[in-house]
């Protein structure tokens, strides 16, 4: 009888034992803290409930969660807000003469916009390795926040096309580590059952930036033009970049690294924090069937068709959302000056913030991903058509509210990804990195579809947006049928008394390979598990 030992972050281990002459897997649990060995073979469900928090620990856990939420979540949302503000102030600066002062033509402006995402995509994978090497999230995140604030501030001094392209590329490089870094960081503080809501709140930072970033830009651009001999768009970079640098220092010294190192936690809270994360990891390790290396996780992710379906879908969503980089330019086509155009950006984003949170909560409550992913598709298409073929202020401004439903899809697809690729963690991490890179690659080429010659309707860009959101919708339909097929296979395979054909065994082997686990564990873990559709 062989065994597979899974190392856990706490002082206990779970050993999965496989016997080829018996059905399923047997679980042998050793708790080393107390030198206790439970020799009886138990089922997977019994193993899951063998170690739980006591009632007293649960009371402490609630206090712990409130303390974590009160500091960590406001900080990460604030930083994500500044991340998008610093990234998108390029569009606001365009309204106040950036193109004119730097002698940029239409194509050169678009290159300056898209080059950021070249650096962003290239830095995605290396950033995770850098974070693991650093080992201190506060220093790691703080350094890159300060770095992109500094780059944003120095952008105010550029005098040429080459200067703006260089600054935008470097900005993409130093902004890239933040998103995967936050995913890693939050996973060290919150259990998997707590992460969904926190990620929804975190994502709202990007939408809030669309609303308040335009209001801040309007105030700066209207009041500081010519101050100390500088154009208002230069002041925009100086002020917003300086604020980001300050926030970076706050994060460096205020953001706690890990529960066991946070001085504001009592010894009891630290113990509960470590214990609850250890229990969460133990359950995850049971699901994974063993520890999976980053290389094995990448291989498993690239062999899974779901990875490619979701990556193409995310590319379509991100590409169709490319209008956000031109939002002030789109509102300017409504017939108002640059300041009013910036103010008009805020209401659609404010609406989207509240709607997206309600959408996400409802989707979780209903337990459905497909319909909540699909219903925004026709809404976005109608919004694009309205912008393309109407002239009045009312319908054209209303079309922007409809176009913003693409951000609702963006939130839903991340929840779908988490369910469609649940284990092992290394596979999920590799799949997320791949999908994020493929998705953001759309931002490299879509800026070139928004040409000044196409004002005020931007029919080429809007037509491409319709095609991209249509592709995302088709991928959603394919995903639904594929998950239904996999659920039927899970239902068939979970019957241990059923005689498996050679074809069934091959399917089970493929499932085990895709999940990164052995065949016996795969069959046992299938019991009762179904993909959310």
Regions found by a protein language model. Give the residues of each.
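Conserved MFS/SLC helix-loop-helix module at the cytosolic interface between two early adjacent transmembrane helices
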Residues: 122-162
